């Protein structure tokens, strides 16, 4: 049976269970986590990604020099449209 190619997701979630047989020979069994573990891992990763996006966004805002109300409004609308477009495609 062919094993699917490793991806960062499978590498970060699966682990190898090493067992010893009675004759002392070791066998390795690849174990995949249960659904609860996968969801926990997914939520942790997504929280890290979301935090990174928020930090990057605030750095961009702080880098603006003397923004006018109109330029801020335009910038917010552009970011909102981009955010909504990405949300619909993912």
Swiss-Prot record:
Protein keywords: Apoptosis, Host cytoplasm, Host membrane, Host mitochondrion, Host mitochondrion inner membrane, Host nucleus, Host-virus interaction, Inhibition of host innate immune response by virus, Inhibition of host MAVS by virus, Inhibition of host RLR pathway by virus, Membrane, Modulation of host cell apoptosis by virus, Viral immunoevasion
Residues at the site labelled Low pathogenicity: 66
Compartments where found: Host mitochondrion inner membrane; Host nucleus; Host cytoplasm, Host cytosol
One example of a Gene Ontology biological process annotation: symbiont-mediated suppression of host cytoplasmic pattern recognition receptor signaling pathway via inhibition of MAVS activity
Region (Mitochondrial targeting sequence): 65-87
Keyword Membrane: yes
Annotated GO CC locations: host cell cytosol; host cell mitochondrial inner membrane; host cell nucleus; membrane
Pfam families: PB1-F2
Domain of life assignment: Viruses
Composition bias, Polar residues: 7-16
Chain segments carrying region Disordered: 1-26
Assembly and interaction partners: Oligomer. Interacts with human SLC25A6/ANT3 and VDAC1. Interacts with host MAVS.
Family designation: Belongs to the influenza viruses PB1-F2 family.
More about this protein: Is not encoded in all strains, and seems to be dispensable for replication.
Function according to Swiss-Prot or TrEMBL: Plays an important role in promoting lung pathology in both primary viral infection and secondary bacterial infection. Promotes alteration of mitochondrial morphology, dissipation of mitochondrial membrane potential, and cell death. Alternatively, inhibits the production of interferon in the infected cell at the level of host mitochondrial antiviral signaling MAVS. Its level of expression differs greatly depending on which cell type is infected, in a manner that is independent of the levels of expression of other viral proteins. Monocytic cells are more affected than epithelial cells.
Protein name, as recorded: Protein PB1-F2
Organism: Influenza A virus (strain A/Gull/Maryland/704/1977 H13N6)
